[in-house]
């Protein structure tokens, strides 16, 4: 299956946050200063690149999306250079000029592909009156599908609680790249995207995955967050949601050249995809692919659709196990394919004597999504359900036959009377049964609907069932 990228030209995001100018001085280094034992860099090129929240906007614009940037700047040359560059990239901007502060600028001196030194020119915008900023946000926010907040702790988002309140009023998803240890100010946001260091600064050191998951869910519950996307350097990313198992996205870069601005790229692509109605899993998958591309570039950079597509299609062909699996492996492989944006279909039954009705039903079920899980009653479960003379075929044979079908991705068994616990663990996008079931009476149906999935009843061949086949065989034996 090939991953289809969304039409990023239709993405629609408002970006608010700390705006910076990233200035790069490039030069050659061939001698040591006589004044002090430091290298002398002969500058031969100067490049100015929008950074911080402006880099988030640049990444969205690089995809062809519609984006507006709002933030605080000084009254200076750096602000003018930002305005010129953003306008060239077709980014709409609303800058609130503060004459008591300079535009934040980070100057990096580069030589021989190495950063020699970084010099920061800044005065945090703390205690600056944000009334004008809030008024501009109130005007433009209803025109956009997603709000991306880029917090570098420079003061622009000191009013973040009020911004979140307004966005929630308009039911607009809020994606925040956070900073600092006061995550309480982000209460009510949709998604936070901390890196691992930022996450552990809040919850404490996490020695294993179990602790990460536990503390992440505690954090989400405490601050009313829908999800956390933790960026983990060479370990990729982990998406954690309150009621679902974590999703892991492996790092996609072949070689990490420069991580500058990678977090901006993640927020930009994630926000753009969500603004197009993509689900959270696929949006994170695309953001992870974008991050894998941007860290292979030097300096503050952006990605385009072709670069994301190149990473995505290579990632798509990563092999994952199929066939007969246990519950632990099933949860893992479902996590992997969900990270690719694939939809999960799940059905269950005894499947004692496989027949035409089963095959046609499973073919129709597979058409609903990308992956089909068949949960099979164990022998003990079947006897409790069908009687002491069933099953005709033992579990191993039933699962083997099902796993050989091209439309079936995974076969898993359950020993309980019904698969409710398994359904809750997997949380399929589609729960399917065949026959004359009422949706309200399907085991796990209400739970799947509550988690945003769908419950489907497919037409079953009336003259085909294992029981009727067995009955016919018994009649023929009598005759």
UniProtKB/Swiss-Prot annotation:
This is Bifunctional protein HldE. Residues 1-319 are annotated as: Ribokinase. Homodimer. The keyword Membrane does not apply. GO terms for molecular function: ATP binding; heptose 7-phosphate kinase activity; heptose-1-phosphate adenylyltransferase activity; phosphotransferase activity, alcohol group as acceptor. Catalyzes the ADP transfer from ATP to D-glycero-beta-D-manno-heptose 1-phosphate, yielding ADP-D-glycero-beta-D-manno-heptose. One of its GO terms (cellular component) is cytosol. Pathway: Nucleotide-sugar biosynthesis; ADP-L-glycero-beta-D-manno-heptose biosynthesis; ADP-L-glycero-beta-D-manno-heptose from D-glycero-beta-D-manno-heptose 7-phosphate: step 1/4; Nucleotide-sugar biosynthesis; ADP-L-glycero-beta-D-manno-heptose biosynthesis; ADP-L-glycero-beta-D-manno-heptose from D-glycero-beta-D-manno-heptose 7-phosphate: step 3/4. InterPro entries: Bifunc_HldE, Carboh/pur_kinase_PfkB_CS, Cyt_trans-like, PfkB_dom, RfaE_dom_I, RfaE_dom_II, Ribokinase-like, Rossmann-like_a/b/a_fold. It comes from the Bacteria. It catalyses: D-glycero-beta-D-manno-heptose 7-phosphate + ATP = D-glycero-beta-D-manno-heptose 1,7-bisphosphate + ADP + H(+); D-glycero-beta-D-manno-heptose 1-phosphate + ATP + H(+) = ADP-D-glycero-beta-D-manno-heptose + diphosphate. GO terms for biological process: ADP-L-glycero-beta-D-manno-heptose biosynthetic process. Its EC number is 2.7.1.167, 2.7.7.70.
């Amino acid at each position: 299956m090939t991953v289809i990228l969304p039409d990023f030209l239709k993405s629609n995001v408002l970006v608010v946050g700390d705006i910076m100018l990233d200035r790069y001085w490039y030069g050659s280094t061939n001698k040591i200063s006589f004044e002090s034992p430091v290298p002398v860099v002969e500058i031969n090129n100067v490049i100015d690149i929008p950074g911080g929240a402006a880099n988030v906007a640049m990444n969205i614009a690089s995809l062809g999306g519609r984006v507006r940037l709002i933030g605080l700047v000084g009254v200076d040359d750096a602000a003018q250079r930002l305005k010129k560059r953003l306008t060239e990239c077709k980014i709409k901007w609303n800058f609130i000029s503060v004459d008591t502060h300079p535009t934040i600028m980070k100057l990096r001196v580069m030589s021989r592909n190495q950063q020699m030194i970084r010099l920061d020119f800044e005065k945090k915008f703390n205690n600056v009156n944000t009334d004008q900023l809030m008024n501009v946000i109130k005007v433009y926010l209803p025109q956009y599908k997603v709000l991306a907040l880029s917090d570098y702790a420079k003061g622009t988002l000191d009013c973040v609680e009020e911004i979140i309140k307004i966005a929630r009023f308009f039911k607009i998803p809020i994606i925040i790249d956070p900073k600092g240890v006061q995550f309480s100010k982000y209460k009510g946001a949709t998604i936070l995207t901390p890196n691992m260091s930022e996450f552990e600064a809040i919850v404490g050191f996490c020695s294993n995955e179990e602790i990460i998951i536990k503390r992440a869910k505690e954090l989400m519950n405490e601050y009313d967050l829908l999800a956390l996307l933790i960026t983990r350097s060479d370990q990729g990313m982990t998406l954690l949601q309150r009621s679902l198992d974590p999703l892991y996205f492996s790092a996609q870069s072949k070689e990490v050249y420069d991580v500058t601005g990678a977090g901006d790229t993640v927020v930009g692509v994630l926000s753009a995809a969500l603004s197009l109605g993509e689900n959270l899993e696929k949006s994170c998958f695309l953001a992870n692919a974008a991050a894998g591309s941007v860290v292979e570039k030097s300096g503050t950079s952006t990605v385009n659709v072709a670069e994301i597509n190149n990473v995505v299609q290579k990632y798509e062909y990563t092999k994952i196990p199929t066939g007969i699996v246990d519950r632990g492996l099933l949860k893992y492989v479902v996590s992997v394919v969900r990270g690719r944006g694939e939809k999960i279909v799940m059905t269950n039954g005894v499947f004692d004597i496989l027949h035409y009705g089963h095959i046609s039903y499973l073919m129709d079920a597979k058409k609903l999504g990308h992956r089909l899980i068949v949960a099979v009653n164990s022998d003990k479960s079947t006897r409790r359900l069908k009687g002491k003379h069933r099953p005709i075929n033992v579990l191993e044979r039933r699962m083997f036959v099902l796993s050989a079908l091209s439309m079936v991705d995974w076969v898993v068994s359950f020993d309980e009377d019904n698969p409710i616990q398994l359904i809750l663990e997997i949380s399929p996008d589609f729960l399917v049964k065949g026959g004359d079931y009422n949706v309200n009476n399907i085991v796990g149906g209400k739970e799947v609907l509550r988690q945003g999935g769908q419950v489907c009843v497919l037409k079953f061949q009336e003259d085909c069932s294992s029981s009727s086949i067995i009955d016919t065989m018994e009649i023929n034996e009598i005759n």
